[in-house]
Swiss-Prot record:
Primary role: Removes the formyl group from the N-terminal Met of newly synthesized proteins. Requires at least a dipeptide for an efficient rate of reaction. N-terminal L-methionine is a prerequisite for activity but the enzyme has broad specificity at other positions.
Pfam families on file: Pep_deformylase (PF01327)
Residues binding Fe cation, per UniProt: 131, 174, 178
First-tier enzyme category under EC: hydrolase
CDD domains attached to this UniProt entry: Pep_deformylase
Official protein name in the record: Peptide deformylase
Reported cofactor(s): Fe(2+)
């Protein structure tokens, strides 16, 4: 049984055992485009990926299932070499600890996502990046575009174009990298991991 057939079964919930780790060749392969119109199998896969993110952000479910919290997941991380990503970025509480008016700043399953335009300015997260497929800390600034325009198809097969900046931009670029065989630490300066080039925006 291949990975996708296993994962899309009605009884299956994605957990950490489904996520492959660095060293697996699928993480270094360029994934295939998803065919349109979308198959039921690919739609279900996307929905299962999104459900994993929801579960991973729920403290009770995450503890019960032994999940690491995540804001993004790409199909290649499940050993499925297809250009499918899910992103679920929660909005923070305000300064007084009140919940946000909108729960998520970005909530989408993207098929065949690609960066079609980007800023000259670059950005990096101040605390670096992590990855569900990497079981170690890799310190350093992961240099990416500060702003991007993304084209993708949603699960209804509609073509969408969105502009992203800040943390949302970083998350989507990280996941698209997975569909191109790129790991986040490939973008860290090997000689000086915390070097700051002119104009680099540090996102805290």
């Amino acid at each position: 049984m291949d990975a996708q057939t296993k994962i899309i079964r009605a009884s299956h919930m994605i957990d950490m055992n489904d996520i492959i780790r660095e060293g697996n060749p699928t993480l270094r392969a360029v994934a295939e485009d998803v065919t349109l119109p979308l198959s039921d199998e690919d739609i279900i896969l996307g929905e299962k990926m999104m459900q994993f993110l929801r579960n991973s952000q729920d403290p009770v479910i995450a503890e019960k299932m032994g999940l690491r919290g995540g804001v993004g997941l790409a199909a290649p991380q499940l050993d499925i070499s297809k250009r499918i990503i899910a992103v679920l970025v929660p909005n923070p509480e305000d300064a007084k600890g009140n919940p946000p008016k909108e729960a998520y700043s970005l909530q989408e399953i993207m098929y065949n996502p690609k960066v079609v335009a980007h800023s000259v300015q670059e950005a990096a997260l101040g605390n670096g990046e992590g990855c569900l497929s990497v079981d170690r800390d890799v310190p350093g600034y992961v240099v990416r575009h500060a702003r991007v325009t993304i084209e993708y198809f949603n699960k209804e097969g509609e073509k969408k174009r969105i502009k992203l900046r800040g943390y949302d931009s970083i998350v989507v670029q990280h996941e698209i990298d997975h569909t191109n065989g790129i790991m986040f630490y490939d973008r860290i300066n090997k000689d000086n991991p915390f070097t700051i080039k002119d104009g680099l925006l540090i996102i805290e």
